[in-house]
């Protein structure tokens, strides 16, 4: 049985999509079968994995709103074992369309259910909001990774996200756990980055991943080429960081 992991933080530009793309690619490189669900209308995870959004005929939108078979929405990528269900700009209005649907918070859970038997990991890239699509993702997920960027206001909004997780856990998804807090955009030369690292570790202790995602030029460049950093430059710090993160997650889940 596979594991569904949502990557969520309502604060934008924290490295959420970058982590989704490169963690997925790293897990697949380590011979895990991985499915990415792009649940962000911006569709950056889709383009970052080489999907031409204009050519997508069936996306996560059709699965959630029109009850399309998710298998019709699965696209392969350049990495063996890594597939993706693309997003679409129509997802912007999906939350309004879902308001009158029965069990509207559990639609994604029903959509993804059959896929747990076909993949080792399903990663959901959430939009930077706590709207109905993100609530669906957290209701469907077994756990959540919370990226925290090592910059000013890093912990801004975290308490609101944690409260949302607590509510979802109590009312919709009792098995939801925090997979871990992931420090991103870390630059050890900066005093601020080290201060934030210390603060996050003090607050969340063993929930913080040992792996830290460092600032890296190759990591920033890879999405514009539509490939994960491990294909763009396998020797880069960004590629090595995400491989280490993938191995840490595999090890945690094998215990």
Which residues are covered by each model-predicted region?
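P-loop NTP-binding core
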Residues: 1-255
């Amino acid at each position: 049985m596979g594991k569904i992991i949502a990557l969520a933080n309502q604060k934008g530009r924290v490295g959420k999509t970058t982590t989704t793309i490169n963690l997925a690619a790293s897990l697949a490189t380590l011979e895990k079968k991985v499915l990415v669900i792009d649940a962000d209308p911006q569709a950056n995870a889709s383009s970052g994995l080489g999907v031409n959004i204009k050519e997508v005929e069936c996306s996560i939108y059709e699965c959630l709103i029109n009850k399309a078979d998710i298998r019709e929405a699965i696209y392969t990528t350049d990495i063996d074992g890594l597939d993706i269900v693309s997003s679409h700009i129509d997802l912007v209005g999906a939350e309004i369309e879902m308001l009158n649907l029965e069990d509207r918070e559990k639609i994604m859970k029903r959509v993804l259910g059959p896929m747990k038997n076909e993949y080792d990991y399903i990663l959901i890239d959430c939009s930077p909001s706590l709207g109905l699509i993100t609530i669906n993702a957290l209701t469907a997920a077994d756990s959540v990774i919370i990226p925290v960027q090592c910059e000013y206001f890093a912990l801004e909004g975290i308490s609101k996200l944690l409260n949302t997780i607590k509510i979802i856990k109590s009312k919709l998804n009792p098995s939801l756990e925090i997979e871990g807090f992931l420090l991103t955009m870390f630059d050890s030369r900066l005093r601020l980055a080290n201060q934030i690292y210390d603060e996050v570790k003090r607050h969340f202790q063993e929930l913080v991943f040992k792996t830290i995602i460092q600032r890296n030029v190759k990591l920033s460049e890879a999405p514009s080429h539509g490939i994960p950093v491990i294909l763009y430059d396998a020797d880069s710090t960004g590629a090595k960081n995400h491989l280490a993160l993938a191995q840490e997650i595999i090890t945690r889940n094998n215990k």
